């Protein structure tokens, strides 16, 4: 769904979908067929969404290489902290330049 509206599903639904795919995988010819069935049963608009949840669960469990959910959250937090520190640093540089200019002025 590139460029389309994004719908957030509750974590409980995501976890349930992943469990259901694992449970019914053997009843289908392919993983995609199981994923499509689960998406239909749970009312998830796009089977690709469920596929992504399954892949992320595999990464989180260490069964597939990639960035875990925990690592992604930490990266997001660190990037936010870094941006905040850069803003604070820019403010401090501006303030120090201002005060340095004040000190260089001759006293009246």
UniProtKB/Swiss-Prot annotation:
Gene Ontology cellular component terms for the protein in this record: plasma membrane
Q: Can you name one GO molecular function term for this protein?
A: transposase activity
Q: Which key words are in the record? A: Transposable element
Alphabetically, which GO biological process terms does the record hold?
A: DNA transposition
InterPro entries in alphabetical order? Homeodomain-like_sf, Transposase_8, WH-like_DNA-bd_sf
Source organism superkingdom: Bacteria
Nucleotide-binding among keywords: no
Q: Which family does it belong to?
A: Belongs to the transposase 8 family.
Name-wise, this protein is Insertion element IS6110 uncharacterized 12.0 kDa protein
Q: From which organism does this entry originate?
A: Mycobacterium tuberculosis (strain ATCC 25618 / H37Rv)
